[in-house]
Amino acid sequence: MNRLRKGDEVIVIAGKDKGKRGSVSQVMQNGKLIVDGINLAKKHVKPNPMTGEQGGIVSKEMPVDASNVALYNPETKKADRVGVRVEGDVKTRFFKSNGKSVDA
């Protein structure tokens, strides 16, 4: 079970965007995440007359390693570690600081 999922609110704990918050928009298989508004890079795009795309410089979100982000706990308003608790056949994620469920 992945500790971070699409739609989770995360906070960056290392790197150039340290301290910024965002929502996970994509989880990749190689342990990287794409977070809205984090790790923006400028990409030069060629115009494509076939599709009608205009050329120019575009800001694009680049992947961030999962080890550089932590789940944001809205109760404590801080980054928090995540654990997995097995209740019967169901796995649920919980915050390590207060034991409350993430998915509730």
Curated annotation (Swiss-Prot):
Keywords: Ribonucleoprotein, Ribosomal protein, RNA-binding, rRNA-binding
InterPro entries hit by this protein: KOW, Rib_uL2_dom2, Ribosomal_uL24, Ribosomal_uL24_CS, Ribosomal_uL24_KOW, Translation_prot_SH3-like_sf
Domain of life: Bacteria
GO biological process entries: translation
Methyltransferase found in the keyword field: no
Complex formation: Part of the 50S ribosomal subunit.
Record protein name field: Large ribosomal subunit protein uL24
Protein species of origin: Hydrogenovibrio crunogenus (strain DSM 25203 / XCL-2) (Thiomicrospira crunogena)
